[in-house]
Amino acid sequence: VDFLNARARENQWGFVDFNRPMVAINQWEQAADSMYTLCGKDRIHPSTDGHLVMAYLFLKAQGLAGKPVADIRIDGAGKKVTRSDNCRVSDLSVSSDNLTFTYEAKSLPYPIDTSYYDNEKHTQADALSVIPFMDEMNYEGLSVSGLSDGYYGLTIGGEFIGRFTARELERGINMALLQNTPQYKQAMKIRQMNEERWLKE
């Protein structure tokens, strides 16, 4: 790996080391479970969770860690938007029992796959236990401060999404974890089309 990295630097090529971090994850996890592996049945190529780990390492090497899908922060008491990263937030309206706004995202959340393929032992979702993908690359944050104690319903496009406490909303929720949002469903359709294309190749 060091040799390849040196050649890449000499030739001004991009370089990503998949081997060392993936071996390190395997060794760490095997300390608790000797059968753990990010590899597939052939013990060489990555399994479904291993592919997500590789994607994470590749994207991180491109400097994409820490860039949110979106990050919305609203001061409910002050009736103002304090942050709108990678999105547009407009039409904020705050009343005694309601807070509404228009949210236009510039990207979609990544829909984590929980399906098993080709008799694999792991799913893509299993990778989330060994990499901080959701925090670093799949964060669609919504934070609302200044709310009175109690429970609040979140609706998007007229659809009920979930119920959260004022404390949870102040701390911030990751909407990419909510599989019933319109944006998650849209991302699922794109993933399905991509899988159909992949099966035809």
Residue spans for each PLM region:
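Solvent-exposed loop/turn segments at secondary-structure junctions
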Residues: 20-24, 44
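Short, flexible, mixed-charge acidic loops at enzyme active sites
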Residues: 26-34
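Conserved catalytic region of serine esterases and O-acyltransferases that act on ester linkages
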Residues: 37-201
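Generic secondary-structure signature for well-ordered alpha-helical cores
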Residues: 5, 9-10, 27, 59-67
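Active-site-proximal cofactor/substrate-binding loop regions of enzyme domains
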Residues: 1-19
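Active-site-proximal beta-strand/loop segments in catalytic clefts of secreted hydrolases
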Residues: 18-21, 54
